[in-house]
């Protein structure tokens, strides 16, 4: 992430002598702020876009590398590895700073069946649906990543775009339904979905992969503890997974630049300290 938390973390890590790369899909929430006048050091209001531009420029000056890529997954084998569209990035430490997770659409039945057929991680849960029919809710690269994880395991995958246009090239064996999802069916477990127009599809699982993978979605993929849309961290910004840190809006609390910068500084410092210890 290249918002206040991500750039702050990168600044502290690179100045501590750590090779530091920022993976960013592009401007985030800060870029949309028209005027900021409560941030330290500015005599006049500054736009979010300008503050972001200056921060990135400073990070580049200090040696931070920037890669434009959309993170779609996070795994751990010999190293933590961030999966992006087209390439994987192994790292000794990862700091999640991609902002607050997007709200899940208020589709009746969706929230109530989480863990009982509704999932947010194909890599985690595909095994439980082997030989069954499932649906993926989404339309972009993140949804494609989940589809690709499911296809070798399940019997069939149906894509539910919920009215959004397709933003990725999906395999031909995936059936696409563009209609709005009206309700997720099932009393104790998912039994299907109902779309606008009265269409009902029998499925055993619904995998939510809307928009881009937020910090919380990535944390879930590797087993880090989350609390709702918030990643659980300690005072060092360390998650429950060794080597994985989180900072900024994704940890909850005050959604302000100053708080994000502090947490990024803490995460970058602690990650660098841990790497020096080996």
Predicted regions and their residues:
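Hydrophobic/aromatic beta-strand patches that form the interior of the parallel beta-sheet core
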Residues: 21-23, 67, 95, 119, ...
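Beta1-alpha1 glycine-rich phosphate/pyrophosphate-binding loop at the start
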Residues: 2-53, 58, 132-133, 138, ...
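N-terminal-biased segments
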Residues: 1-22, 96, 100-106, 193, ...
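Short loop/helix-cap segments at secondary-structure boundaries that form the rim of catalytic
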Residues: 32-33, 106-111, 127-129, 166-173
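Glycine/small-residue-rich loop that forms an oxyanion/phosphate-binding "nest" at active or ligand-binding sites
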Residues: 62-131, 137-139
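FAD-site-proximal beta/loop scaffold in flavoenzymes
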Residues: 101, 106, 112-128, 210-259, ...
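A Rossmann-like FAD-binding core segment of flavoenzymes
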Residues: 30, 53-77, 81-83, 88-91, ...
């Amino acid at each position: 992430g290249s918002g206040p938390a991500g750039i702050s973390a990168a600044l502290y890590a690179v100045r501590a002598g750590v090779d530091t790369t920022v993976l960013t899909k592009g401007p985030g929430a800060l870029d949309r702020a028209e005027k900021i006048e409560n941030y330290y050091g500015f005599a006049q209001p500054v736009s979010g876009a300008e503050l972001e531009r200056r921060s990135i420029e400073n990070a580049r000056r200090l040696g931070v590398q920037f890669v434009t890529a959309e993170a779609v997954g996070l795994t751990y084998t010999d190293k933590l590895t961030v999966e992006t569209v087209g390439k994987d990035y192994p790292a000794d430490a990862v700091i999640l700073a991609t902002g607050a997770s997007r709200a899940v659409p208020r589709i009746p039945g969706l929230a109530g069946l989480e863990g009982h057929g509704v999932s947010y991680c194909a890599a985690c849960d595909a095994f439980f649906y082997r030989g069954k029919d499932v649906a993926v809710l989404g339309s972009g690269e993140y949804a494609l990543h989940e589809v690709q994880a499911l296809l070798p395991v399940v019997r069939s995958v149906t894509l539910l775009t919920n009215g959004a246009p397709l933003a990725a090239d999906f395999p031909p064996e995936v059936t696409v339904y563009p209609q709005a999802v009206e309700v997720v069916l099932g009393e104790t477990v998912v039994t299907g979905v109902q779309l606008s127009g009265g269409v009902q599809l029998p499925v055993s699982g619904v995998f939510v992969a809307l928009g881009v993978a937020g910090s919380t979605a990535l944390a879930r993929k590797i087993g880090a503890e989350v609390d709702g849309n918030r990643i659980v961290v300690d005072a060092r910004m360390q998650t429950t997974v060794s080597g994985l840190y989180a900072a900024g809006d994704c940890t909850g609390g005050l959604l302000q630049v100053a708080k994000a910068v502090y947490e990024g500084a803490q995460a970058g410092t602690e990650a660098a300290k841990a790497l020096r210890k080996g």
